[in-house]
Amino acid sequence: MANTSLDMASSTSPSPSPESTTTPRKRIVVVGLGMVGIAFIEKLIKLDTQRQYEIVVIGEEPHVAYNRVGLTSFFSHREVEQLYLNPLEWYKQHLQTSSLTHHLSTAALSLSPATKSLTISPPPSTPSLTTLPYDHLILATGSSALLPTSTPGHDASGVFVYRNIADLQSLITWSSDTQIKGSTGVVVGGGLLGLEAAKALMDLQVFGRVVVIERNGWVLSRQVDGEAGALVLEGVRGLGVEVLTRKRVKEVECDESKDEGEKEKKRVKGIRFEDGEYLACSTICFAIGIKARDELAREAGITCAERGGGGIVVDDSLQTSAPDVYAIGECASWKGQTFGLIGPGVEMADVLAFNFTQAHLHTPRVFKRPDLSTKLKLLGVEVASFGDFFADRDGPKELPPKLRRELKKSGGKAEVKALTYKDPFLSVYKKYIFTSDGKYLLGGMMIGDTTDYVRLVPLVKTHKELDVPPSQLILGAKKSGDDNGDDDLPDDTQICSCHNVTKADLVAPLKSGECTSLGDLKSCTKAGTGCGGCMPLVTSIFNRTMASLGTEVKNNLCPHFPEYSRADLYNIISVKRLRTLPDVMREAGADADSLGCEACKPAIASIFASLWNDHVMSPAHHGLQDTNDRFMGNIQRNGTFSVVPRVAAGEITPEKLIVIGEVAKEYNLYTKITGGQRIDMFGAKKQDLLKIWKKLVDAGMESGHAYAKSLRTVKSCVGTTWCRYGVGDSVGMAVRLEERYKGLRGPHKIKGGVSGCTRECAEAGNKDFGLIATEKGFNILICGNGGTTPKHSVLLAKDVPPTNVIPIIDRFLMFYIRTADKLQRTARWLEALPGGIDYLKEVILEDRLGICASLEAQMQELVDSYFDEWAEALNNPAMQERFKQFANTDEGQPPMEVEIDRGQERPVMWPREDEGGSAKADFKGLRDKWSSTTWQPVLEASYFQGADDLPNGISASIKRGDTQLAVWRIKGKYYASQQMCPHKRTFALSDGFVGTDPSPSSCSSSALPPSPPSTPPRSSSPVTSPPQSPTSSATPATTASSSCTTNPSGPASPWISCPFHKRNFSLTSGSCKNDNELSIATFDVEERDDGMVYIKLPPVDELDRELGTKKWMVKKGEAGEGQLRELDELNKSKGVEGKKGRRGRKPGASEAGKEVGKKLVEAVGGGGCGGPGLEW
């Protein structure tokens, strides 16, 4: 299976870049095929998804790029191919896909910046090629090993350097001479490279003695102090390598002999030191330093450094003094420094490749002081140095910003303290250097035990203030709290704020056995029956508690799918390509003919949307949608809807703002800026939605999907667009992400954010996916959320180039959509995911499951199939018919009284349920109490055409006098009830889900309870009849040809789930299935041959007395004087009310205490500055 990991050289995923790929490619010529040169090429190929460049690289050696850091291993296998950084096939592959051409055994002879051309020695593969024109030239020529040219005998036979494969091969050939066996081999230089060379001489196994000569008092003098060096010295000597310290070579003494051609030849005989001592030897390897290879640039007139090791002078962008010529790696001199470690060279390559490919989407990166931390195993000794490891000797080079500001303010001097640990028995030495207050780690060194290296280096890089004493770092003591232990919430934690249900309230009935299912728990405690936002946590507590009691907890979607979770159903629907609820019920349901319920319907609708992306109002899917999706707007407290056009990344033009203002003013809509940086218009009547959206769509706006379990917004700060601190183009990236994922539906809502720097103004760290710009790209954080149980995001990937952001997020979102449970946010999903973030990284970044290509392709298919739902609805007459308050009249009726608040109209407050908020009258008993009933025609039966084939049937809201009624046709049967849900006295039952309990066996329409016999005369005129008992009803004289009548109570009788808080009412008995205190009135209903639907109703005035809208609608004053009345009174008494533009003043503690006393202190909790006054 093809590896689609992002470590591959290229990605086929679309880039957010708007640039065209038809422009001619620019040529980049790279001089030098070493580790830094190939690092640049790899990064450029990876980032250049638009294929803007062709690359030509030349290398002097006959080998492709190999690992110079691992040169010592060459002596064990002597196969250079084992050191190759990429196999030869890699070069062939990218010749085809990325226009990479490489020439080996080819030297750069001269450079002409004026003509932008490079003269080269003819490559063996292309002898006619002598000149390479370039658009950009990258000099990665590296360095050469220093030889002491002033030392006599430095050029004798037997003198080597330790730099490349050719040096090692020469050393191997030399050591095969029989004269060498048993002799002494010498390494001059006790640094990193010198100790590596010493190991190489040992591995040759021909020298009787290997000696290292170091002019300082200890080895590794550039990495460790004297005490640490002495410990290394002890370890090296223990392995059989002799070390002479404080020795300087005066002369290499030679034997002068003649070869077969009688040509004089000098051969190493020994070393004379400056102190007069002599050491006989046959072989010398100099490892005394390096010199930058800058001759090509120097001869071309490009500025080079004159001191130190030379080097081609570069600026922070790594450009030389010549236009379009750059230098990276050991040949580059940055701020007077050259770097002989691979790390800084790779960082240079990274910066340059990023700027060539990503700078048009992001702030160009600059090269900064590199991290010179090293961790090596030299001759069996573990050695590491990190950060400012000589800060105690030379003074600190850099201080944490916070400390630097404090010292600047106080005029103090930077002081450091070193903490040292030495264990002579285990040969362990550690020295960590801290600021004088012990709050910051600046650097350190480790010998013998380097296990803490990975943990400590980030503390230095990030300047993180320590939360443990320095001694705990150096001793490796366990930080208090490292053991996470039990992360369960305390028992008194409030889980459901709507009904003030604590964790203990949920656990107790489960442990007592009173509740054995999630539905029982909701009915018993009322948790999750309010806003529903606590349900993920309620479910989690239920599952944990039941598991602790030894009860098996099945993660099935609902009773209709007892064997399958949402993820299971996703796979079944995907593989079998199911597209309707009946199809799914037949394939996976407990009852093939079931209508489903309020749990499985929206979950299956979400799966359909994630797979097939059909319109939510299409006939097959409309009945599966919750009320918000059903009318493409969030239903509000009073039954009206909110209107939220998309404002990608919060960026909006003045023209669109004006249109929004005009629409809000025309339809008297309450307006508010949302937390997602867009404008919400509240109070839109269902019958006005089409007209409102027509104006918005005509102005170039589209649905913001604020109503859907889908991508909501991608919030952004202004980033580099305006902010002087901006590092990345957060607005541009957020716009691209929101435009890409708009309309994407999932198990729950999805929110994103992009911040332009670490100040994090967009709060990307608590989003389902968030980006924070860094100098190298973006850090990608995932699986955070606010809500009932807030959770900070976790880091998925660091420093991701902009072109790789989208493939990663594509994979993450699709994997979440495929595997999450119903109504499970990404935070809870990750918590429940086996293996957690480490496993997710393997799946998303390393393609552990081999599905990354599939995830990207599926996301692209959804992106390509996007359409604006509101624009489609405006062009579909059938959809438009659904936007009516009443099916039998164009009249409107307000569902709740309104009041003016801060200049805008809003619905009055709901009273508390225990103070009249719920209508707990015996509505179901009205069937026995009507003085008389007559069959009344209410609506043409054609309105319900096609209902029998739909998962929710077809419903209608009917106005009769002042009373609102609801009528359904479901699987050939009619049902009627009051429109009002008594829980909150809202008028919306006709817009709810219809559900049935699953039968033990498959049901058909014939298995439903039979219709009552027909006795009333078939007539359009009212016919009176006496009241009937709940178990008997007046029957019509003749039934319609469809035999379609009221369905009495039975095992498969349907219920209606209120769209507000999911109270479920039987459409036959009127009883509430999940709240025994509530009920609704139901009515007999039938279709007759005259094409009308009839409901058996009492007289209008009697109907209105019991069910009239004016009687039950929530009115002003019912909720009391308001939650903030006391606060308003306080402000009024302080003279604050109504003032604008005032300067803040803080009341004195004594004055506040006199006026409001203890009550104010309890309400506010005191001020953050120590006073009890209010702080806003």
From Swiss-Prot:
Q: Does the keyword Transcription apply?
A: no
List UniProt keywords, sorted A-Z.
2Fe-2S, 4Fe-4S, FAD, Flavoprotein, Heme, Iron, Iron-sulfur, Metal-binding, NADP, Nitrate assimilation, Oxidoreductase
GO BP term, example: nitrate assimilation
- Cofactor(s) in the UniProt record: siroheme; [4Fe-4S] cluster; FAD; [2Fe-2S] cluster
* Disordered: annotated span: 1-23, 998-1051, 1124-1157
Pfam families from the entry? Answer: Fer2_BFD, NIR_SIR, NIR_SIR_ferr, Pyr_redox_2, Rieske
Q: Which residues bind [4Fe-4S] cluster?
A: C717, C723, C757, C761
Please give the pathway this protein is involved in. Answer: Nitrogen metabolism; nitrate reduction (assimilation)
**Which InterPro entries does the UniProt record give?**
BFD-like_2Fe2S-bd_dom (IPR007419), BFD-like_2Fe2S-bd_dom_sf (IPR041854), FAD/NAD-bd_sf (IPR036188), FAD/NAD-binding_dom (IPR023753), NasD-like (IPR052034), NiRdtase/SiRdtase_haem-b_fer (IPR005117), Nit/Sulf_reduc_fer-like_dom_sf (IPR036136), Nitri_red_NirB (IPR012744)
Q: What induces or represses its expression, per the UniProt entry?
A: By nitrate.
Which residues are listed for NAD(+) binding in this entry? 183-215
Where's the Rieske domain? 942-1094
Tell me the cofactor note: Binds 1 siroheme per subunit. Binds 1 [4Fe-4S] cluster per subunit.
Catalysed reactions, semicolon-separated: NH4(+) + 3 NADP(+) + 2 H2O = nitrite + 3 NADPH + 5 H(+); NH4(+) + 3 NAD(+) + 2 H2O = nitrite + 3 NADH + 5 H(+)
Q: Quote the record's binding site residues for FAD.
A: 26-60
Similarity remark: Belongs to the nitrite and sulfite reductase 4Fe-4S domain family.
Q: How does it assemble?
A: Homodimer.
The protein's name: Nitrite reductase [NAD(P)H]
User: Which species does the entry assign this protein to?
Assistant: Neurospora crassa (strain ATCC 24698 / 74-OR23-1A / CBS 708.71 / DSM 1257 / FGSC 987)
